[in-house]
Design a protein with these regions (language model features):
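Alpha-helical protein-protein interaction elements
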Residues: 11, 59, 88, 127-129
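Long, well-ordered mid-to-C-terminal structural blocks that present hydrophobic/aromatic surfaces
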Residues: 15-19
C-alpha cells in the first residue's frame, strides 16, 4: 500500500499504510490532529534474526494526554483485541519515523518520501532502488 485513503475506500482493502491513511483522514476531517508512524515488530520469542518488514500505525492527539496510538489493521486482524489497539501498541514495536511526505537531512534532491522505513540513496540526484531492504536484530 501507499497510504492512500481514496484507494482504500475504492478497493475496500489495503495494508497497514492504507488503513492508517484512512484513519488519519477521518480524524483530521473532524479537526483531530493525527499523524502516521512506521517501524517494525520484533518477534519477542527470538533473540536475534530478521523480521518480515515494516508495520505502521496512526496516532491522534488528545489534550491533556498527548499522542494516542491506534493500530486499526491489527485490530481488524484480531477483533478480540480491538479495544487494546485503540490506545495501546504491543511492546515488540520499534518506531522508526513519523509523518509522510518527508524531506531528509541533508535534503534529498528527489521528491519528498511518502514514508521513510527503508534505506534511501540517490545517484546524481536520482533515487536509487538497488539498496538492500531487510531488517535484522539481536539482543544486546
Amino acid at each position: 500500500g501507499q497510504g492512500d485513503a481514496v484507494h482504500a475506500c475504492d478497493a475496500l482493502t489495503g495494508n497497514c499504510t492504507d488503513y492508517h491513511a484512512y484513519f488519519i483522514a477521518l480524524a483530521r476531517s473532524l479537526g483531530i490532529p493525527a499523524r502516521f508512524a512506521i517501524g517494525a515488530a520484533i518477534p519477542s520469542e527470538r533473540h536475534d534474526g530478521g523480521t518480515d518488514g515494516y508495520h505502521c500505525w496512526a496516532e491522534f492527539w488528545v489534550d491533556g494526554i498527548g499522542w494516542v496510538p491506534v493500530d486499526a489493521s491489527e485490530a481488524d486482524k484480531h477483533p478480540e483485541l480491538a479495544d487494546y489497539y485503540f490506545g495501546s501498541l504491543t511492546a515488540d514495536r520499534v518506531a522508526f519515523t513519523q509523518g509522510r511526505d518527508l524531506t531528509l537531512v541533508p535534503p534529498q534532491q528527489g521528491p519528498p518520501l511518502n514514508f521513510f522505513i527503508y534505506p534511501y540513496a540517490e545517484l546524481d540526484g536520482v533515487p536509487f532502488d538497488g539498496v538492500t531492504r531487510s531488517f535484522a536484530f539481536e539482543d544486546v
